[in-house]
Regions:
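Hydrophobic alpha-helical segments, especially transmembrane helices
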Residues: 81-82, 90, 115, 126
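Active-site acidic-Proline motif in GNAT/NAT acetyltransferases
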Residues: 85-91, 119-120
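Loop/helix-junction capping segments adjacent to catalytic residues or to phosphate/diphosphate-binding pockets
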Residues: 10-14, 91, 122
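Acetyl-CoA-dependent GNAT
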Residues: 7-80, 85-86, 98-100, 104, ...
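C-terminal "cap" of GNAT-fold acetyltransferases
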Residues: 3, 111-114, 118-131, 135-170
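Conserved G/P- and acidic residue-centered "switch" motifs that form tight phosphate/ATP-binding loops
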Residues: 61, 92, 109
Length: 170
């Protein structure tokens, strides 16, 4: 069973920090995460309410993944740090996390959500496209050549219906 939890206390922050550290280990040679330790040390940082959110996922009670969102501009937010531990992949946890953060972002008043995805993240890109994200021109610098930039409109009626339907089944 998959359970999602918004980061609300020091224990949750410590769990998020552990997942962020695990995520950083998978991207040791990625120039986009060179100053990542500062972000880890300052959690929840830019992902704190009211402009941000950080969600943890548990599979059968075990910490499995996370996702975060923060404000980019009025009405626009950015999804970051979607990560599922390798031992929990293939169970739909990433999809649950993305759909939950989309719903949270819409409830926070954002109308669009953006993200960037490096070339090696093919599975994540397929997930984003299956949910309804579309490619856009670069909106920020990412030092990884071939990075794709995506956006989704959060007040899309079909997306809202999809999220409501999934709420009934999770």
């Amino acid at each position: 069973m998959i359970k999602l939890q918004t980061v609300e206390n020091a224990d949750h922050v410590a769990q998020a920090r552990a997942l962020f550290q695990e995520y950083a280990e998978t991207r040791k040679h990625d120039p986009a995460v060179e100053n990542f330790q500062e972000e880890i040390d300052n959690l929840p940082g830019k992902y704190a309410a009211p402009d941000g959110n950080l969600i943890l996922a548990y599979s059968d009670g075990k910490l499995a993944g996370c996702v975060a969102v923060h404000k980019l501009a009025d009405g626009v937010c950015e999804m970051k740090r979607l990560y599922v531990s390798p031992r929990f992949r293939g169970r739909g946890i990433g999809r649950h996390l993305v759909e939950a953060i989309l719903k949270q972002a819409a409830m926070m008043g954002y109308s669009r959500l953006r993200l960037d995805s490096i070339p090696s993240m093919k599975e994540a890109q397929a997930l984003y496209e299956s949910i309804g994200f579309y490619e856009i021109p670069a909106y920020r610098h990412n030092p990884n050549e071939g990075t794709k930039y995506y956006e989704i409109e959060l007040h899309n009626k079909s997306m809202n219906l999809m999220l409501r339907k999934r709420d009934l089944t999770t």
